[in-house]
Amino acid sequence: MEPAFGEVNQLGGVFVNGRPLPNAIRLRIVELAQLGIRPCDISRQLRVSHGCVSKILARYNETGSILPGAIGGSKPRVTTPTVVKHIRTYKQRDPGIFAWEIRDRLLADGVCDKYNVPSVSSISRILRNKIGNLAQQGHYDSYKQHQPTPQPALPYNHIYSYPSPITAAAAKVPTPPGVPAIPGSVAMPRTWPSSHSVTDILGIRSITDQVSDSSPYHSPKVEEWSSLGRNNFPAAAPHAVNGLEKGALEQEAKYGQAPNGLPAVGSFVSASSMAPYPTPAQVSPYMTYSAAPSGYVAGHGWQHAGGTSLSPHNCDIPASLAFKGMQAAREGSHSVTASVL
C-alpha cells in the first residue's frame, strides 16, 4: 500500500523526503543484487532512484546490515544527570567560570574520561538551558533574604489632619515601628477657613503662625498680608494722569510691605516728593590767565566778590612772582602811547 503523502521521483516511484526507505524494499534490493542484476536494472524495476540503490548496496557490503541510521551507531549520551549536577556545582561556586574550565575540572575530578566528556558547546548549552534559570532563581532568592524589609510609609493623618473628629482619632494612631516619631510642631493641624485664597489652600497661614509663636523675633503674620487691600492706599488725584505719578504710586504699593527684619515703610521716600536735581553751572570755553606758577587754569564763568580778573579766587599776587614778559608789555604800551601823543 502506497503512502497517502509523498513525492514522485523520475521513475514514477513515490518517496517521502527525509524518511528512510522501507525495510522490505531494502531487502528486495539486496536479493536482486545477489541474483546478479545490475543496480540500474534494480532501480528501474523497483522504481527507486539509482543513488538510493547504490547507497544501500554499499552499506550492506561494508557492514552487512540493511538498517538505516549511522553505521557505528549514535554517540552515547554524555550529558547525564550526574554530569549536569557537577556542572551546576562548579557554576555555583564560581559564577564566572568558563565552559572549557568546567570541561577540564570534569576530567580532573574523574567525573568523565576523554571518551565521554561533553564538548565545550554541550557545556555551554547546559549552562544556558538547564542551569541558567536555576542560577537566576537562586540569586533572586538570596537577594530577597539579604534585602531589608521595607519600612511602612508615614501615616496620612499625621501630616494632613482636619478640624473634625478624625483629628482626635488620627492623634491616637500609634507610630509604626521603625519610623521616627513626628513632633507636634511638624504635625500641625490644618484649619480650612471659609475663604478660598491661595494662602489658605496651601496652608501658609498655619505654618507662619506657629513659626511666629515659637520665634523670639517679631514677624508679620500672613493675616496682615492677606488683609492688605487697595483701600489702605490713598486714591490718586484726578489730575494725576501721567505715567510718572502712576509709577510712583505703584512703587509705593509694591514696596509698602516690609519683610521680616527690614525697616518700616516710613523710612522710604516716594519719587514724586523729591526735589529735582540742580542745573550744573556752565563752564566757559575760554581760558583766563592765572598768576599761579603752575600754568594756565580754566577759569569759571563767575568771579568772587572780592577778586579781580587776574585773581578770581581773591588771592594776592606777591610782587616777586611777576613775570618779565608782562612788565615789558606794559612798558611797550606806555611808550607807544607817549609817542602818539
Swiss-Prot record:
| Listed GO MF terms | DNA-binding transcription factor activity, RNA polymerase II-specific; RNA polymerase II cis-regulatory region sequence-specific DNA binding
Gene name, please?
Answer: PAX9
Please give the biological process terms from Gene Ontology that the record holds: regulation of transcription by RNA polymerase II
Q: Which PANTHER family match?
A: PAIRED BOX PROTEIN PAX-6-RELATED-RELATED (PTHR45636), PAIRED BOX PROTEIN PAX-9 (PTHR45636:SF13)
Q: What is its main location?
A: nucleus
Its protein name is: Paired box protein Pax-9
Quote the DNA-binding region ranges, renumbered to this chain: 4-130
Which portions of the sequence form the region RED subdomain?
A: 82-130
Task: Give the species this sequence originates from.
Answer: Pan troglodytes (Chimpanzee)
- State its role: Transcription factor required for normal development of thymus, parathyroid glands, ultimobranchial bodies, teeth, skeletal elements of skull and larynx as well as distal limbs.
